[in-house]
Structures are given as C-alpha cells and as structure tokens.
Amino acid sequence: YHGYDIDTNKRITISTWQSLYKLDRKFFKDYGAVIGDEAHLFKAVSLTKIMTKLTDCKYRIGLTGTLDDSKTHKLVLQGLFGMVNKVVSTAELIDRKQLAQLKVVCLNLKYNEIESKKVKDVKYFEELEYITSSNPRNKYIRNLALALKGNTLLLFQLVEKHGEILFKLIKEKANQKRKVFFVFGGTDTDDREQIRAITEREENAIIVASYGTFSTGINIRNLHNIVFSSPTKSPIRVLQSIGRGLRLSLIHISEPTRQSL
C-alpha cells in the first residue's frame, strides 16, 4: 500500500487496489493466481483494469457475501473470475450459530401534511437533503442511538449536512463516560483502526460513520446495533452494512422501550 515498494521477491503480495491499478501490464506477468476480497466491488473500472492486466493468471478467486440482483453485475464478475459458486447462505450460518441472530426493525416516521407536500414532487437528492436536515428527525435518531443498549454503528451519507450534525447532537446529550466516535473519509486509517479496537472493548460506544468508511470490510466483533440514518438505494450497501452486526458477541443486549425514545 502507500509508502511501500512494489518490487518484491516474495511469493505472495497483499495490496490495496489503489496501489496497483495504474501499474503497467508487465508488473502482473509473473502472477499465476489472484484472490479478490469483496469481489462485488470489482465491477468498478479501476479493479476491472487490474483483472484484465492479469492475462497469464490461471487461478482467479473472488470472495463476497453480497451480489446485487442485476444481470450486468453478475456477468461482469463472471467474466473476471468465472462462474458464481454459492458456498453458504447467511441464514445457514445463523442457524449454525456462526453468525449472530438478526432482527430488522423498520421505524416509520410520520410527517404532517404540510411537511409532506414540500417534498411530494422533488427529486431523490432533494428529498434526501430535506429529511437529513429535519431537526425533529435528527433528534429522534439521536434519542434512538442513546437509548439502544450495547455498541451502536450509526451510518450516514452526507458528511457536513448530516454526519457532523448527528455527531454533535449525540455528543452533547451522551453521558460523559460514554464513548462517541465520528468517522468519515477524512479520518486517518490508523485512527479508524484505533476506534474499531476501542469499540470491541466497550459495551455502549456509538460510532457515527459514513457509509463509505464503515459499511464494508470493517470487522467489529462487539457490535450490537446498526442504525441507517440516511436512506440508500444500493442493495449491496444495505447487506454489507447489516453484515457489520453479524459478528458474534458474548454480551446479551436488551431492546430500548418506546418511552425511552
């Protein structure tokens, strides 16, 4: 990754895709196998470039827990890695007690008629900006995050217009001893790892994080609640985000009461 020499005499190279996709074809000529983690991301142009440069690579393995329903996405991945082989489902792993029990709760917030008419005919992004700037809605999310027992991951989409606001609201009302973290694209990688490690040792921490930083690839074994504070239309993002909460935890957590919100 950044800061390390790409030339090596080792048999195995572990790298971020950002460090590789601009390299010439000759760099890849000696590799006979490639393993792509989070393979659902390989439809991106940069990752596709890497795979197409591996012309002499005989063994191609892609690993993912989520594929979207679009035929195009599936065909792109088949072209890069080969036919899809489903090894096991999430439901099976839950039944085997290798993943945590999952409960999805849909909280339907009602708006009055005047407020509803304001966004009746607007486009998606305008509606997104409207609901994320709603003070009553944000306070409800704050109260929800504070009422939930256990470690909570609260995901947002817009950093300045939503994430920073939620973090401030939660931080102001949280008990001084309760740890509240804010993570977005500008957060240093080492700081993110430190936050992850601290949360694994806590019992009631709150992480306010952007989808881009904490919805995929982050492994927190002691995470009990995930709150989607911003809507998202991506099935993969939803499933990957839920996956953050499927790691097993030894701590039993009770649910918040309606009165606590």
What positions do the PLM features span?
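Conserved interdomain hinge at the start of the Helicase C-terminal
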Residues: 122-154, 165-168
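Conserved helix/coil segment N-terminal to the catalytic DExD/H
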Residues: 4-33, 44-49
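Conserved helicase ATPase core of P-loop NTP-dependent helicases/translocases
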Residues: 5-8, 180-211
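Single conserved hydrophobic/aromatic residue that forms the stacking wall/gate
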Residues: 251-261
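Conserved helicase motor "Helicase C" RecA-like lobe of SF1/SF2 P-loop NTPases
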Residues: 157-184
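Post-DEXD/H (motif II) to motif III coupling segment of the RecA-like Helicase ATP-binding lobe
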Residues: 40-103
